[in-house]
Amino acid sequence: MNAWFIAAGVMLVGAFGGHVVAGTRFYAKARPERELPGRAPEDAVVAERRAAWMLGRCGFLLISVDLALSAGCFLALGLGLIPRNAVLELFLTLTYAGWGVAWRAVLAADRSPAACRHRLRHWVVFLAVALTAGCGMAL
């Protein structure tokens, strides 16, 4: 049993729940039909915005699946349901470290307003998962 991996998995279960519930509600507000009421779906502007919105939905789905699978892997490793695997552990740890650093850099480079940076502080969770998983790898 590895409590560090269990903790990383639990953090990701929480992140998944928050992502699905709050993220779905937040993202629905950006639906092009809400911004451009009364315009036909065939309208070029609506179609372009709809395509961009759907691409964002694809990314949202990818992140949802990634959070769920990563949580499952960390919990399975922590509970001893699957054997320790250094490559898997390193991959998961570096994935979250990379996401944390990259997302923080994007927010800084974009010079987003403070309220936006505060709302989008996902990098804190990503780095906490990476640090926790790194501690688990050391055992």
Task: Please place each PLM-identified region on the residue numbering.
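Hydrophobic core of alpha-helical transmembrane segments in multi-pass integral membrane proteins
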Residues: 13, 71, 98-102, 126-135
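Membrane-helix boundary connector in multi-pass membrane proteins
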Residues: 82, 101-121, 133-139
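Membrane-water interface of alpha-helical transmembrane segments
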Residues: 2-9, 50-60, 86-89, 115-119
